[in-house]
Amino acid sequence: MGEKRNSCKNKKIVFMGTPEIATYALNALLEKSFDVVAVVCQPDKPIGRKKEIIFSSVKKLAIEKNIKFFQPNKIKEIENELKELNPFAFVTCAFGQFIPDSILSIPEFGCINIHASLLPKYRGGAPIHWAVINGEKETGVCLMRTIKQMDAGDVYCSRKVNIEESDTTSTLFKKMNNLVYDIVLNDLEKVFNLEYPPIKQDESKVSFAYNISKDDEKINFEKNAVEIVNLIRGLSETPGAYCFINDKKMKLFKAVSTNSKSNNAPGTINNISKEGILISTKDFDILVKEVQIEGKNRQEVKNILNGNSEIKIGVTLK
């Protein structure tokens, strides 16, 4: 055990990541006693209506652990500083910036990325969302070599997790957080020790998970019930799948497919009860249990039954 811990301590790591999931990787590096000499994360950005500056999860952890951190607009800006650190490797997780070859060539071992999918499936910035939206039954994380082409490097190892029908992107993120921690804690050192041979990705099986756009968030009731429910699951809790009711945006949450069918046009509200709103689709109705109308708080359908709600039987959602 002593030799393994020492081998970690002797490896200088620069970690690059920004959101919460990346803190699980950084914590695992620290738990494993890697010498994390610096952290690189995205610049602070104003958030919400008040435009408050809120530190990213990784920046907060770097401050807490007293680790030097950088926040360049483009990583090229700190090329000299990174060279001076003389790192053994870069480790990245949800960093959010393109890393050019001039930076990738700095560390002795190169750059290892923790990617939240089972590559070659779902290359890109939103693999967890798209796994749920597309109704996948499993996903995972892998350790891969970073090259110039996005998420196209050789894969060293992976860990899998099941996606339940009840999972949303929010609940799946929690599972993936733990998986990220486990793969860094248990497998990264083996990658550095050349115990895992790199495996080339099968280019014939590549798919992409581009960042979610506003168009992706819009519900199309001409699709079937399962597809719509998966979209709602895949965009919960944020950014939320939406439609329009009387020209107002309405987000839908906690939806399930039913066995009932109506002859009404897709998007029609067929029934409202304490169980939820029953809405027509291309095939079976869906039951939606929570909504958020533009300008109002998110609420359970049972709490709006007695109000003067715009949600009425016969209304068609667009």
Swiss-Prot record:
Chemical reaction(s) catalysed: L-methionyl-tRNA(fMet) + (6R)-10-formyltetrahydrofolate = N-formyl-L-methionyl-tRNA(fMet) + (6S)-5,6,7,8-tetrahydrofolate + H(+)
GO MF assignments: methionyl-tRNA formyltransferase activity
Enzyme Commission numbers on file: 2.1.2.9
Function: Attaches a formyl group to the free amino group of methionyl-tRNA(fMet). The formyl group appears to play a dual role in the initiator identity of N-formylmethionyl-tRNA by promoting its recognition by IF2 and preventing the misappropriation of this tRNA by the elongation apparatus.
NCBIfam families registered for this protein in UniProt: fmt (TIGR00460)
Gene Ontology CC terms, in alphabetical order: cytosol
Protein name: Methionyl-tRNA formyltransferase
Organism phylogeny: Bacteria, Bacillati, Mycoplasmatota, Mycoplasmoidales, Mycoplasmoidaceae
Family in the record: Belongs to the Fmt family.
Record's keyword annotation contains Disulfide bond: no
Keyword Plastid part of the UniProt annotation: no
SUPFAM superfamilies in alphabetical order: FMT C-terminal domain-like (SSF50486), Formyltransferase (SSF53328)
Keywords: Protein biosynthesis, Transferase
Superkingdom field: Bacteria
Family annotation (HAMAP family): Formyl_trans (MF_00182)
Binding site for (6S)-5,6,7,8-tetrahydrofolate: 117-120
